């Protein structure tokens, strides 16, 4: 789409959801005051670019201030889920292994006789990694390799 269409789309989105615009603006203002953004778990992301005299660097800093609290919180949550899944697999004496984390995805090598148990462990670990006011929804797929699982 053109820049104009994208701009119109964003403008309409914020008109429809004005509280989101307010939230984003407050995240940027808070980061400008403190020099960092915070995740829901109070993990700091320094943003020195917000103090730059260079417009492009400052704009980058503002985008970081908008995205870091949300993306950083998601990263914190997936790490907590990984710990829960790893601990449950270890405690249960499973041969299956947590291999890889890609953004909000966990890749688990699972033995055929453990598939159903491991699915339950993953579901519990991811859905209950943290208590929020909204449920954490997950998708789970399986295959003989990563490609098949997608």
What are these regions (language model features)?
Residues 1-5, 106-121:
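Catalytic palm subdomain of template-directed nucleic-acid polymerases
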Residues 1-94, 100-101, 111, 141-150:
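Conserved catalytic core of nucleic-acid polymerases
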Residues 99-103, 135:
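Short Gly/Ser/Thr- and Asp/Glu-enriched loop/turn motifs at secondary-structure junctions
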Residues 130-141:
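Conserved short beta-strand edge segments in small beta-sheet-based binding/regulatory domains
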């Amino acid at each position: 789409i053109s820049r104009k269409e994208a701009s119109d789309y964003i403008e309409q989105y914020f008109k429809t959801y004005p509280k989101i615009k307010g939230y984003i603006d407050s995240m940027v203002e808070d980061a400008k005051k403190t020099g960092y953004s915070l995740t829901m778990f109070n993990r700091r992301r320094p943003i020195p670019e917000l103090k730059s005299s260079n417009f492009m660097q400052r704009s980058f800093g503002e985008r970081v201030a908008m995205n870091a609290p949300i993306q950083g919180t998601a990263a914190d949550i997936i790490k907590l889920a990984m710990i829960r899944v790893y601990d449950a697999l270890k405690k249960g004496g499973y041969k299956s292994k947590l291999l890889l984390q890609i953004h909000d995805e966990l890749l688990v090598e699972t033995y055929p006789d453990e598939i159903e148990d491991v699915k339950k462990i993953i579901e519990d670990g991811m859905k209950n990694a943290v208590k929020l006011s909204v449920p954490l929804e997950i998708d789970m797929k399986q295959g003989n390799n990563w490609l098949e699982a997608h």
